[in-house]
């Protein structure tokens, strides 16, 4: 967590919170992110070996996502962030706590949903029903209507359902990351699992959020 705090301190959202930077980051990784394992992929596919490990007794579920850095735009404003697309829309709320910061109520994410995290929504002056623009790989700008705004403290995110992303961006879903829940609590066991994942074909890196 200290490593994350040092690298992302300038991107953290305050909202009047008086906690230390490390406290804010801990909130992100204990309350917002419900997964604790991150596997980065090299070839946009999950190998059979990785699937076997993730489907084993050491894990309590996982989701595959496509995450790309992008500029989030509205009007004349533009901020660097990420677009994140889950392979299955219903998975996102299982592994990320999609909630309204002020009310604590869950925010729906289904086919056709587009959620933006709270800080960029404020910076861009966008509310539910507003429009955020991103560029596809060919440089064409694509508008997305925001269906919800969710709590988040590290980086700026735009969550788009896979069907909508593929149809509007004219690009296929290509997985770049696996987010998983590891049930092992022993440090040595977790290290062994990460090393085993790291050895699998197509895996670039594997580790735990607590060690990032």
What residue ranges belong to the model's regions?
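A cross-kingdom feature of multi-pass membrane systems that activates on extracytoplasmic/periplasmic
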Residues: 179-182, 187, 191-212
């Amino acid at each position: 967590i200290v490593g994350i705090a040092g690298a992302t301190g300038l991107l953290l959202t305050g909202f009047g919170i008086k906690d230390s930077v490390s406290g804010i980051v801990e909130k992100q990784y204990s309350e917002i992110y419900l997964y604790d394992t991150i596997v980065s992929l090299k070839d946009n596919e999950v190998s059979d070996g990785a699937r076997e490990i993730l489907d084993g007794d050491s894990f309590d579920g996982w989701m595959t996502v496509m995450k790309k850095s992008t500029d989030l735009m509205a009007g004349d404003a533009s901020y660097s962030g990420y677009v994140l697309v889950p392979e299955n829309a219903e998975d996102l709320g299982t592994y990320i706590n999609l909630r309204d910061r002020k009310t604590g109520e869950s925010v729906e994410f289904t086919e056709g949903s587009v959620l933006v995290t709270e800080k960029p929504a404020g910076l861009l002056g966008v509310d539910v029903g507003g429009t955020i623009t991103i560029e596809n790989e060919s440089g064409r700008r694509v508008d997305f209507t925001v269906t919800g705004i969710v709590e988040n403290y590290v980086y700026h995110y735009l969550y788009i359902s896979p069907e909508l992303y593929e149809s509007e961006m004219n690009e296929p879903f290509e997985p770049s990351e696996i987010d998983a829940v590891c049930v092992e609590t022993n440090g040595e066991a977790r290290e062994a699992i990460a090393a085993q994942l790291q050895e699998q074909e197509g895996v670039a890196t594997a580790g735990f959020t607590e060690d990032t």
